[in-house]
C-alpha cells in the first residue's frame, strides 16, 4: 500500500492529523510499513503503549524490518537501556541503508553511555543426538537471525551415529 497522505503528514510533523488519517487503516489489513508509520505517530503523540502494539504487530508480519527494531529500541530506551541496545543491535543487523546504519549506531553508542548498560554475549547450547537435518536447520536459523558477534554457539553431541558432528 502507498500510505501517501499519512507519510506526508508525518513528514510535516502534523501528528494529530496523521492520527486521524491513521484511523482509516486501523481495522484493515496491516503490513510492516503501516506498523512503522503507526508506531511513529503513536510515539510522537506520547502513546508509547499504542506504539508498542503497532511494533509487535509489524514484527509478526516481518521480523526483519530494521525500522521496527529502531522504534522498539526507542520504546525500551525509556525503560531499560539493555533491551534498547539489543533492539538497536537487531536494527543494525537487518539494515542495509548506510545513512540509517549511522543513525542506529549513534543510538547504540548513546545507550552504551548509560551507567546501567551491561550487555553480554549469549551462549546458545544445542544438545544433539542424531537428527542431523533438524540440527542444521536450527543452526541455520540462529545464523540467519542473530548478529554473529552477539552469541557463541555450543553444540554438545550425545554419541550420534548419523554423522551429526
Task: Describe each region flagged by the PLM.
Residues 7, 40, 74-77:
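Residue-level recognition of tetratricopeptide repeat
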Residues 29-30, 63, 96:
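Short coil turns that delineate tetratricopeptide repeat
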Residues 24-25, 57-58, 90-91:
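Canonical positions in the second alpha-helix
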Residues 157-165:
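A conserved acidic beta->alpha catalytic loop
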Residues 12, 45, 78-79:
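Structural motif corresponding to the intra-repeat A-B loop/turn of tetratricopeptide repeats
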Residues 85-144:
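N-proximal low-complexity "stem/linker" segments adjacent to membrane-targeting elements
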Residues 34-35, 68, 100-104:
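TPR alpha-solenoid repeat register
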Amino acid at each position: 500500500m502507498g500510505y501517501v497522505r499519512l507519510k506526508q503528514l508525518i513528514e510535516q510533523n502534523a501528528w494529530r492529523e496523521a492520527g486521524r488519517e491513521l484511523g482509516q487503516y486501523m481495522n484493515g489489513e496491516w503490513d510492516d510499513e503501516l506498523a512503522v508509520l503507526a508506531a511513529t505517530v503513536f510515539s510522537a503523540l506520547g502513546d508509547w503503549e499504542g506504539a508498542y502494539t503497532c511494533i509487535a504487530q509489524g514484527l509478526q508480519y516481518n521480523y526483519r524490518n530494521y525500522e521496527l527494531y529502531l522504534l522498539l529500541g526507542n520504546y525500551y530506551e525509556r525503560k531499560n537501556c539493555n533491551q534498547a541496545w539489543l533492539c538497536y543491535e537487531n536494527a543494525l543487523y537487518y539494515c542495509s541503508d548506510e545513512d540509517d546504519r549511522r543513525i542506529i549506531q549513534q543510538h547504540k553508542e548513546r545507550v552504551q553511555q548509560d551507567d546501567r548498560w551491561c550487555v553480554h554475549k549469549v551462549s546458545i547450547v544445542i544438545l544433539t543426538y542424531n537428527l542431523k537435518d533438524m540440527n542444521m536447520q536450527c543452526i541455520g536459523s540462529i545464523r540467519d537471525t542473530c548478529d554473529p558477534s552477539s552469541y557463541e554457539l555450543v553444540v554438545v553431541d550425545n554419541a550420534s551415529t548419523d554423522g551429526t558432528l
